[in-house]
Amino acid sequence: MTTTTTTRLLLAAILLAVAAADDDGQTLLEIKKSFRNVDNVLYDWAGDGAPRRYCSWRGVLCDNVTFAVAALNLSGLNLGGEISPAIGNLKSVESIDLKSNELSGQIPDEIGDCTSLKTLDLSSNNLGGDIPFSISKLKHLENLILKNNQLVGMIPSTLSQLPNLKILDLAQNKLNGEIPRLIYWNEVLQYLGLRSNNLEGSLSPEMCQLTGLWYFDVKNNSLTGIIPDTIGNCTSFQVLDLSYNRLTGEIPFNIGFLQVATLSLQGNNFSGPIPSVIGLMQALAVLDLSFNQLSGPIPSILGNLTYTEKLYLQGNRLTGSIPPELGNMSTLHYLELNDNQLTGFIPPELGKLTGLFDLNLANNNLEGPIPDNISSCMNLISFNAYGNKLNGTVPRSLHKLESITYLNLSSNYLSGAIPIELAKMKNLDTLDLSCNMVAGPIPSAIGSLEHLLRLNFSNNNLVGYIPAEFGNLRSIMEIDLSSNHLGGLIPQEVGMLQNLILLKLESNNITGDVSSLINCFSLNVLNVSYNNLAGIVPTDNNFSRFSPDSFLGNPGLCGYWLGSSCYSTSHVQRSSVSRSAILGIAVAGLVILLMILAAACWPHWAQVPKDVSLCKPDIHALPSSNVPPKLVILHMNMAFLVYEDIMRMTENLSEKYIIGYGASSTVYKCVLKNCKPVAIKKLYAHYPQSLKEFETELETVGSIKHRNLVSLQGYSLSPAGNLLFYDYLENGSLWDVLHAGSSKKQKLDWEARLRIALGAAQGLAYLHHDCNPRIIHRDVKSKNILLDKDYEAHLADFGIAKSLCTSKTHTSTYVMGTIGYIDPEYACTSRLNEKSDVYSYGIVLLELLTGKKPVDNECNLHHLILSKAADNTVMEMVDPDIADTCKDLGEVKKVFQLALLCSKRQPSDRPTMHEVVRVLDCLVYPDPPSKPALPPALPQSSTVPSYVNEYVSLRGGSTLSCENSSSASDAELFLKFGEVISQNTE
């Protein structure tokens, strides 16, 4: 009887659960109503909500017995709208994952009614408001992940009432107030992530009550006070990150009792000495004490840290010599001692650090020669000894550093000649020997450094000529040879350097004219003042950018820029011949005499020390020397990688992994441990003006997710090179497909081109209209439109653009962009707004329509199309691949119209990108989705992953498809701007 009763009760419970589950289908449909952008991602969420149906809907996992919703995973679908309060009706759901969408509004209080919930992940959205107190009702909750939103208010102290909470990640929000002390009494909490908020108050002595906590991160807040003396009791900590707060006092002695792998205290106001006991923390892999006010010597006992890979002590007030014992740190990869007050010699023992990637000794008071032993650091990528008192010569043995990309020995007292062996350092992208006493000629072999981006030999005693071999520096962006004794002409070969942005030759003895530079279209900074140049200063091409100050001190130069006429009457010419001849003979004799005297005195005056301090810039103006080389992961598909992993996988960014070059970066391909490929962009700029602002911008960009934008997965900033990690897209750039050689060039039919145009427009429209703050791309071009395996367009390189200010326009100090795509209004005024991007996009449309480059053999595609439009012959320019595959050439004509509208000369006459999307959307007619083969969002499993696997597997994704617009709005757009296909739109 008892067994029968029990069975009946069990069956009754199951029937009740099944009956309750019948409501889950209707609940899901109610949740869908609050979402936007659902048409192409939740297309199967339809019908009457019967159990057997909704359990097969995308992202829905049901219990095998009751058919109740057990898990809901809609991550990475770019869903907009809000979270419906109806979500509280999912009584049996154990996991809700809505991360990496565009959800806004507040977290509904009804979330507290999901009483079975174990994992709640709403990260990487735009959710605002307070964290609801109702979450404290979720007694089974193990993982609460709300990072990267816009949440405000205080952290609810009621979160301490969650007895099973193991992961609490509230990073990258706008939370304020203090960290609730009651949280520290949660016995099972293992992960506490609070970085990048506005938290105040002090570190509680009770923080070590968390006996299971291994990850404690409060980086980038406004915490004050001292590190509590009880810190030594936090024996379970593996990662302790207190960086970028306002903490003061000395580093407590008992911090040495910790067995952490990462100890990061940088960017605070700690003072006093470095505790010697830190040398006993054998588990340390990363020790970062940089950018504080620490004083005294570097403890020699730090040499005992044989497992430490990164040692950052820069930006303090450390004195004394560099301990030779640091050479015993056998696994060290990064040694940053710059911006201190260190004295003495560079220890030869540092040569034992054969695994070292980065050695930064800049801005100290080090003396003596550079030891030859440094060349034993075979894996060294960056060596910076700028701003010391080093003497002797540049070691010839440095050429053994085959992996080095960055060499800066500037602002010292180095003498002798430039070793020709430096030309063997084939991976160099930066070579800076400026502000020394280096003498003799420039070795012509330097011209063989094909990856060189920046060359600075200024403020030395160099003689001879500028080598014509510099014309082989195809990647070079900056050349500074100013303040030397160079003579001869500016080589014609230098005028062929298409990537050259800066050329400084002032204060030399250079002769001839400047006409050879007229074809350096990218040249933005030119200074040839105080030489012996003569002739006419051009006024066209790039020379329109330069002020008269660029040409001062050259009496023989003339022209419009200098306010002096290059032509005089024949009478004046004849009357001055005799006087000129006499004067010329006298001057020539004097010059010959001076040359003889100079040759006799050369060995003596070549060694006269210069005042190095005159060319030593303010260290605060060069934050790059203060950049700790850290790897920051923004999305978890790269989680638990370290910088060394990436260096190892790419063999220290070997050239064999290069897949492309850009105006601002070299691009490498790296296959991660999980076999997922990523693209690594190594930026040419080493010195962001504001490191913290730059990092904040990168983190913001990393949170931007859209189907048609290339996602920033992470970044690393260091003097060795700033690296950005992006999604890798299989089919390269649109430029490759349209213009590359036979190996990459593909035939694109009309439908594919339309979809590429629409995808790029959707990505750009999202930046202009849906980001907060809005973003101007600044360099829209076919090389920045990448194509995935299905040839869907993804807009790249939007990440480094400055966010729009609250004003309507943004004034840039220099013209950005690529020749052929630059808005003429922007080029003339440097005033930048969204319409500058619209112009560039219009040029991309012309590329798609014609298959031709924007500029080719001095032929400008835009001008050519305008002339054809004026003659009503524009259709002659259509790419043959379009003519063969397009069923309605009227569509082609409409896109020509749109391209010319986008590239109108007056910005106010151009459409917005939202309007462009509407027009293209009406031309693209995708088949209605029937039953596309889409993978389920969650594995069909009856169990929910453990909290560790759940958190490790966090990853971004996006599959947004924009809403369609009515044809009426498209017709209104064409009516608004008028027919332009037969008009000259200039």
Curated annotation (Swiss-Prot):
Glycosylated sites: N64, N73, N220, N233, N269, N304, N328, N373, N391, N408, N456, N509, N527, N542
Family matches, as InterPro entries: Kinase-like_dom_sf, Leu-rich_rpt, Leu-rich_rpt_typical-subtyp, LRR_dom_sf, LRR_N_plant-typ, Plant_RL_S/T_kinase, Prot_kinase_dom, Protein_kinase_ATP_BS
Keyword tags: ATP-binding, Cell membrane, Glycoprotein, Growth regulation, Kinase, Leucine-rich repeat, Membrane, Nucleotide-binding, Receptor, Repeat, Serine/threonine-protein kinase, Signal, Transferase, Transmembrane, Transmembrane helix
LRR repeat positions: 68-89, 90-114, 116-138, 139-161, 162-186, 188-210, 211-233, 234-259, 261-280, 281-304, 306-329, 330-352, 354-377, 379-401, 402-425, 427-449, 450-472, 473-498, 500-520, 521-545
Topology feature Cytoplasmic, residues: 603-986
One GO-annotated biological process of the protein: heat acclimation
UniProt signal peptide: 1-21
Listed name of the protein: LRR receptor-like serine/threonine-protein kinase ER2
Gene it is expressed from: ER2
